[in-house]
């Protein structure tokens, strides 16, 4: 009976050690991926586009929260990778970065005429209130 308990405790300890090492490996891989993404030459444009999307979704183009986020992201990029230009990038990451700039959210800022067409075809329904009246859709009378 004691032998089975000892075996079970040994097996349980081994499982915990394996799980711990797997978690550490996953965290290391995640950190490597974050470093590769943030050192990519198009990373600054990715941040800029993301912040533009946040501006549209919030409806407040001069939001201090968004500006603080922009400052924080810029500082973290500078502090993490001061010499990022020498690092090689993968083709999958290159493809992602390039395709991101053709996303619907980017089109909102680059093509004002298609703003509503883009918003109507988002996979999720989004209620947006824009700052300027020319961007507000007419509401149905009840």
UniProtKB/Swiss-Prot annotation:
InterPro entries, per the entry: KNOX1, Leaf_patterning_domain
Pfam families: KNOX1
Tissues and organs where the protein is expressed, per its UniProt entry: Detected in inflorescences, seedlings, leaves, hydathodes, stems, roots, embryo and siliques. Expressed in a polar pattern in organ primordia and at the boundary of mature organs. Detected in the lateral domains of flower meristems, but not in the inflorescence meristem or the vegetative shoot apical meristem.
Residue ranges of coiled coil: 4-36
Domain of life, per lineage: Eukaryota
One Gene Ontology term from the biological process aspect of the record: leaf proximal/distal pattern formation
Entry keyword Ribonucleoprotein: no
Entry's induction text: Down-regulated by the AS1 repressor complex including HDA6.
Signal peptide span: none
Keyword terms, alphabetized: Coiled coil, Cytoplasm, Nucleus, Transcription, Transcription regulation
GO MF annotations in UniProt: DNA binding
GO cellular component: cytoplasm; nucleus
Protein name: Protein KNATM
């Amino acid at each position: 009976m004691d032998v089975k308990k000892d075996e079970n405790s040994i097996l349980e300890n081994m499982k915990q050690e394996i799980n711990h090492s797997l978690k550490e490996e996953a965290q290391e891989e995640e950190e490597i991926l974050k470093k590769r993404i943030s050192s990519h030459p198009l990373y600054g444009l990715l941040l800029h586009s993301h912040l533009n999307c946040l501006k549209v979704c919030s409806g407040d183009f001069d939001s201090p929260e968004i500006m603080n986020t922009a400052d924080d992201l810029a500082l973290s990029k500078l502090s993490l990778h001061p010499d990022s230009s020498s690092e090689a990038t993968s083709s999958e990451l290159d493809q992602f970065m390039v395709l991101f700039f053709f996303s619907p959210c980017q089109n909102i800022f680059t093509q004002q005429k298609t703003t509503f067409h883009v918003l109507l075809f988002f996979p999720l329904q989004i209620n947006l209130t824009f700052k300027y009246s020319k961007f507000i859709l007419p509401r149905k009378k009840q």
